[in-house]
Each structure stands twice: as structure tokens, then as C-alpha cells.
Amino acid sequence: MGKIPAIGIDLGTTYSCVGVWQNSKVEIIANDQGNRTTPSYVAFNETERLIGDPAKNQVAMNAKNTVFDAKRLIGRKFDDKKIQEDLKLWPFKVINEKGKPKIEVEFKGERKRFAPEEISSMVLTKMREIAEVYLGGKVKDAVVTVPAYFNDSQRQATKDAGSIAGLNVLRIINEPTAAALAYGLDKNLKGERNVLIFDLGGGTFDVSVLSIDEGSLFEVKATAGDTHLGGEDFDNRLVNHFAEEFKRKHKSDIKGNARALRRLRTACERAKRTLSSSTEASLEIDALHEGIDFYSKISRARFEELNMDLFRSTMQPVERALSDAKMDKKAIHDVVLVGGSTRIPKIQKLLQDLFGGKQLNLSINPDEAVAYGAAVQAAILTGVGSSQIQDLLLVDVAPLSLGIETAGGVMTNLVERNARIPCKQQQIFTTYSDNQNAVTIQVYEGERAMTKDNNLLGTFNLTGIPPAPRGVPQIEVAFDLNADGILNVNAKDNSTGKSEKITISNDKGRLSKAEIDRMLSEAEKYKVEDDRQRERVQSKNNLEAYIYACRQAVDDAPSGVLSETERSKVRDKCSSEASWLDKNSLAEKEEFESHLKECQRICTPIMSKIHGGKKGKSSMGKGSHPTVEEVDG
């Protein structure tokens, strides 16, 4: 078997998707439920950890211990305004640990705390496992996507999540850029085309303007967006609307009932999807709260009214990206829609009107385009695939200006917003007072004139500057922004040659190497536990299936084949084992196996009489038993 290829993962707020370049094309890989996207949900209960569809499916019964939206927490500080707003809506508990948000759940009877990176790493692990089943081997390398408007600490934290998941993250790439790759390859473009990617997903929003030359040079001209806007916010408006309606109709408030709110949210999500193709949607929820059934309807017009300010707010980044790219709307050849929320007719209408009635391009799958592009980039970086993709060149940009604080708290930019990456910029600075022997370099990102209004990335000192009048020392500060959009800063005193450097690892938001190592070993431990739980359930199912098959065989056996004593012997043994199973459903794998052996010891000789003469065909031969995958109803 050849080398296992690198994969592309779209790590989404609400759903994730994985793809791989194989046989000269991208394969989007379906999960074990047959779905090509997997919910970014992780659930913890008394016995196991669930990831993806199984986690989302049980959320109403276990709302407090089912975690989602990790992407809205990752790389942010606990006191971030957006996190404080979200806290009011999340059913799970988020606590403040040294300024960082941590998620607290109950798992196997114990309180556990997880960093957002750990939850994201569990989703990444699930996506890796989906790919491994398909590819038939261990996957090590991956390209992971992030919103174009993610800042330095959010990018670093996503990379850390990849490390905890045991992945070698080849590159962090921007979601709209990945979607543009998918579009460019799919359409086999000729000549130079200016493309605007409008990417509105479950939790984040990006706009990127690119020029694509001959379908091989992809150059991002500008990017804009909002890392906290998406389908979930539209769901929130619906949830609030119906919660108020319930209160009006039934004089009862459901806001303190986590299970009721979760069931209402699931119904609202479904209604929102229905309203993309119908003008009205119904909600029917039995015994929503205090035994009260809730039935209601909502029209598309009312849904649009509830969200109009959010819908309109998506147009401003479009205008800003065009302005930064120095392009007129008329210069855009294709407006390409990506992300599930672009299916909303009103958003399409607003965008179409903004472009003077221009036909929007709906030709790529909005749920899969980002993973598709990530898989292409993974193939490019590992040197596989045809010249069709090896000749592709991708030029991206920095989403935010980067600079240092100078006298008076002024932000002095070294890297301007929308500068091409990777890039290096340097500038000479000097001292502010006589005989100053050290300078503190404070690195910020953002667009405001004063550093207090921007985001502090990191601080370091350059010491040992020889005494001199103010303005004489020459301190060269160099910014090196790599292809992942992650920053290294170097400061050098030109008179002594002494230098200090820092990789912006944002101590306020980022995990230390030791923390990552600890989380990696914990992730391994959880995997062992998950595998053990899977084996335990399988051995329980095997025993259950064997009991059922023996009973069935005895009941169906023609008269005369077995004596009444033999029939009773099998039935009695099966009854006692079934009774033991009922009382010991949480027993260990070894116990189930031991009971199965005991059951086989008594039943197999009798079973072989029923199947006598059918040597080799019996599914009840010595030591064998039917393997039946059972599904809880």
C-alpha cells in the first residue's frame, strides 16, 4: 500500500467536513452515518464520550454536558464581549481560568474542565478517523481551515488543536481562499477573473476578493468579515421569538429549562432550513415545558424581519473588501456563495441588489467547498497530484494590520491590513529618553490609531542598550508573517548587534508547550477509553445476539430434533443470561465474554444438533456467535 495522503479539514462552528485528493480529484469523505458533514459536537455522559452525529442526537437529553461552538471560544479571552453574550445562550458551563475560557462538564461521574482547543481537537480527531477508515491507514498530515478574519491567537489555537489531535498541521488556510481554489479548479477558468467569495457559515462570516489567472494563480486582494456572525445567530433570534410567544400564550417562561430550550433550538434550526425553500414553516413540539405542547408557525417574511439587521450587516464587509481591493463592483466577474447560511433567499437578494441585479454563482456545494479546497492545498504541499494542481500558486493576505506601540500609545504599523503573506517588514525605532538601557516592544493587531483600542499580541524586552542621548540608538524591529498568518518578531540593537525575538504565542490566549503535551496524552487516554467502551458495547451486543439467536433456533426447531430436556436447558440458560444482562448492562467486556463462553458451552452442542449435517454453514458453530450491530431505538 502506498503512502497515506494528507487530508483537508474544514473545522466548522456547527459542522465539519473532510476531503482528500485521490485519483486526480477530491473525494469528500462520508462519516459512519453516511453523512458528508459531521456536527462539531462533543458529548460526555456516565459511560462514554460521543463525537459528531451521536453527540448531536442526544443533546436534548444531556444539554449541560454536550459541547458545541468551540470555534466561538477558541483563541479568545474569557472577558471577550462576544463570549459574554454567548454565555447567556449556551446550556453548558464556561468558567474563567486565569483569563481563559474553560468548558466544565460531568464525565463518568467527575467534573472535568476542557480548553476550547481540546474540544476542537476531539472534532479534528473524529474527522481524521473518518478519513482513516476510508483510506485504510493512519493519517498524519492535514491542512486545516480557519475564517479569513481569524486573528493571530485564534490561528495559533487552531494549530494547537491539530497538535492535540495528533496531526501535523501542514498549513492553516483561510476558508474563502480554500473555497476559491475549489471554484477555480471546478470551473476550469480561462483568462483573468475577479471573484468575490461570500462565505457565511454556522458561526463565522468572511468576504474575500481574489483575482484568478488562467485558473492557476489565485491572488487574494482583500479580505473582510466577522468571526462571530452566522446561522447560529439567526437561530438565536428564532429561539427568543418563540420563547416569548410561549410565555405570552402559556404564562410560563422556558428560559430556565435547558432541555426545553435545546428542543426549541433544534426545531428552530429545522424551521430556518425549511424557510429557504418554503414561505412558511411549522413547529410542533410535544410537552415542551411543564407538559405543555407547543405548536406554532412562522412565515419567511417574519423570519427575515427578525434577522434583518444581521442580514444587512453582511453587506458592509463586502463593500469594505471591494474598497480595500480597489475594485469597483462592476469589475467582479463572479460572486460565489459558500457556507450553509447563503441558502437564505433574503441574503441572496441583498447581495444580488448590491451588485445591481447580477446573477450569483451557486454552482459549488456550499457545505463542501472549503474542505475541497483544503484537500487540494494538502495535495499541493505534499507534492502529489497532476501538474494541474502542482502548478497552482496561492497568494493570501493578512486580515489585520500588525504593529508596535510607539511614544504616546500610538499604533505604528509594520504590516498593513491585506498585505501579501508570507511577508517580512522592518523599521528602525529609537529610544524615548536619555541613557535608556532597555526598550519594551509591545506588538498589536488591529486598525485603530491608538494601541489601547487594538489587540495586544505579545510583549518582550530588548536590554543592554549602551547609554546614549535619546534618539541616538538604532533599534531595528522586523516582523515576519508566515504562510499560516502567524507572526514572529525580532528586535535588534544595531550598535551592539544584540537581538531578542518572540514568536507571538499570545500568553493570554495560547496554550503552553507543556499544556499541549498534557492534552495530547489525555487525548490518547480518552481514545483508549473510547475504544474500550466500543469493545464493551460490542461484547454486550454479541452476548445479547447469541441469546436471541439460540432462543429463536430452539423455537423454530422441527419437532423430533431436540428433546424437551434440551429445549428447556437452552431456554433456562438463555433466560438466566438475559436476566443477568438486564441487571449488569454496564459490566466490563471480560464479564460479557465470560458469560458468552458459558452460554456457548451449554447451548452450542444442542445448537449443532439443530444444524446437524450443515457442517461449516452453521452460524452457531463451536466458539462462534452471530455478530449483530444493534441500534438503540
Curated annotation (Swiss-Prot):
Top-level taxonomy: Eukaryota, Metazoa, Ecdysozoa, Arthropoda, Hexapoda
This protein's record includes keyword ATP-binding: yes
Keyword ATP-binding listed: yes
Span list, region Disordered: 610-633
Name of encoding gene: Hsc70-2
Family: Belongs to the heat shock protein 70 family.
PANTHER family linked to this entry: HEAT SHOCK PROTEIN 70KDA (PTHR19375)
One GO term describing the cellular component: cytosol
Protein name: Heat shock 70 kDa protein cognate 2
Any one GO molecular function term: protein folding chaperone
InterPro entries for the chain: ATPase_NBD, Heat_shock_70_CS, HSP70_C_sf, HSP70_peptide-bd_sf, Hsp_70_fam
A GO biological process held by the record: chaperone cofactor-dependent protein refolding
Keywords recorded for this protein, A-Z: ATP-binding, Nucleotide-binding, Stress response
